[in-house]
Amino acid sequence: MTEVARLQSFLRAVASPGRTVVEAPPFTAFLDPDDALRFVNYSIPADGAAPDAAAVERLRTVFRKHGRLPRLEWIEQAAPLVARALVEAGMREELRTPLMSCEPTDLVDANVGVEELTVAPVGEADLRETADLQRVAFGDTPLAASDEPRDPRAHGGGAVLARCAGEPLAVAAWTPIMDGVTEIVGVATAEPWRGRGLAGAVTAAGARAAFAAGASLCVLSPGDDLAQRVYARAGFAPVATMLHWSDPD
């Protein structure tokens, strides 16, 4: 198995726990039954997939049936023909970003411009604050009082939360470890505290915790060039290209 195939297999496997999995060949949809947030609902094409217009429309039907925006996330090198079919079907590219990886010996602790900062594993009492910080940072609204926050610790994942004087400032999570691989996800910093090195600090802390839990390789996808530079300073380097596509809102 090539490194790209290994990483795509990992991303497919780690998407399954806690989600409704629906096959729509050559796609597999991973749908959160409790959260319509676009970034936690997506599909992954089979390696080497070459879908036609009918296949894309079947995928759309699956997402719409579940009240979710049709989306895809995959490694370009694993299925390079998919993007052409999506263009022809009227979908759009949300994001093209490097897939970056880091091994334990690569990890670098970040310098942080915040005094009295604490970074600790997320526990039961932190779940709502963690979820709200991530949602607001990604342009969504806080959870409704009746909504239960996702627990990043479910199925063997985890998260770390940075605080100052009790105030939650930044968070990073990691997915369940599969064959020694985990993904750092949900890295978010509260808007007033950005630009102080917190994203790099929680990324490094999350990766270190994942390595301690048994991972031998951490991967992540930066949202933009600035994030890529932040993660590079923490020891991550590009290995492939991640594509994020969706229907227009």
Per-region residue spans from a language model:
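Short amphipathic alpha-helix that is part of the acyltransferase structural core
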Residues: M1-S9, S43-I44, A50, T97-L99, ...
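A conserved beta-strand-loop-helix scaffold within acyl/acetyltransferase catalytic domains
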Residues: P142-A190
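A conserved beta-turn-beta hairpin within the catalytic core of GNAT-like acetyltransferases
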Residues: D35-Y42, E94, P176-I184, R194
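Conserved GNAT acetyl-CoA-binding A-motif
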Residues: H66-I75, A210-G223
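N-terminal charged segments
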Residues: M1-K65, A78-A79, A83
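Conserved active-site alpha-helix within GNAT-family acetyltransferase domains
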Residues: A79-E93, G200, D224-T241
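Acyl-donor-binding surface of acyltransferase catalytic domains
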Residues: A50-A125, W245-D247
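Conserved acetyl-CoA-binding loop-helix of GNAT-fold acetyltransferases
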Residues: D52-R60, V185, T189-E191, G195-A212, ...
